[in-house]
């Protein structure tokens, strides 16, 4: 039996209850084409195939690829040996994603799967069921004013809705990780919020949350005059001394547009 390799961030999910909740959350039907990232030893692959869906599995570990090819002999199963971050996803034709994500690539992988505010992925996946570190899950679902709320929260919520499916304790894995995990369901928006300049919004978010304890007027001073930021916040009905973490997605969209227009005048 192949052992989990630390350099690949491998932890085998072995809880049948958690596996069942992941499959249920994916709402699979015959005709679905599922991108499975990091199939490992096939614990999720088998129920995915049982559902009647087609499965495109991407695995970096060569030894595991050999085992998976022997294990799954189905016309509905395609295995790609390689790095998911280097793979062009569009030609695969998948409409859903199911993944037990290696925690060391979570950030880049989210960008690869969802795109960005400036360059959203199109066509978008219908839904993504992702097993992630609890800290990341908290950030994806965070509300304004909370400790977990940050630029990642705003970016992801611009692109998709995010809901918790279930908590996953360390004992659900072999070997158990040192952190708690969570399964989340991401459903990309069919219609994205309107924004005058997506790149400008990205720039504001990066700068605003880089020094999150500073008032926005000071955090953004390399981009906009502090007094203009204060006036813009007041115009939007917000406190002139607001910090980045106090603003909702809607606030950021409105602030971005007001400041963009000020910059043009």
Curated annotation (Swiss-Prot):
GO cellular component: cytosol
Cleavable signal peptide: none
Domain of life: Bacteria
Chain positions recorded as S-adenosyl-L-methionine binding sites: 11, 13, 38, 59, 83, 100
GO MF annotations in UniProt: 16S rRNA (adenine(1518)-N(6)/adenine(1519)-N(6))-dimethyltransferase activity; RNA binding
Entry-linked InterPro entries: KsgA/Erm, rRNA_Ade_diMease-like_C, rRNA_Ade_Mease_Trfase_CS, rRNA_Ade_methylase_Trfase_N, rRNA_adenine_dimethylase, SAM-dependent_MTases_sf
Compartment(s) where it occurs, according to its Swiss-Prot or TrEMBL record: Cytoplasm
EC number in record: 2.1.1.182
Gene3D superfamilies in alphabetical order: Ribosomal RNA adenine dimethylase-like, domain 2, Vaccinia Virus protein VP39
Keywords noted in UniProt: Cytoplasm, Methyltransferase, RNA-binding, rRNA processing, S-adenosyl-L-methionine, Transferase
Any single Pfam family the record assigns to this protein: RrnaAD
Reaction(s) catalysed (UniProt annotation): adenosine(1518)/adenosine(1519) in 16S rRNA + 4 S-adenosyl-L-methionine = N(6)-dimethyladenosine(1518)/N(6)-dimethyladenosine(1519) in 16S rRNA + 4 S-adenosyl-L-homocysteine + 4 H(+)
Protein function: Specifically dimethylates two adjacent adenosines (A1518 and A1519) in the loop of a conserved hairpin near the 3'-end of 16S rRNA in the 30S particle. May play a critical role in biogenesis of 30S subunits.
Family membership: Belongs to the class I-like SAM-binding methyltransferase superfamily. rRNA adenine N(6)-methyltransferase family. RsmA subfamily.
NCBIfam families recorded: ksgA (TIGR00755)
Protein's name in the database: Ribosomal RNA small subunit methyltransferase A
Lineage of the species this protein comes from: Bacteria, Bacillati, Cyanobacteriota, Cyanophyceae, Acaryochloridales
Gene that this sequence comes from: rsmA
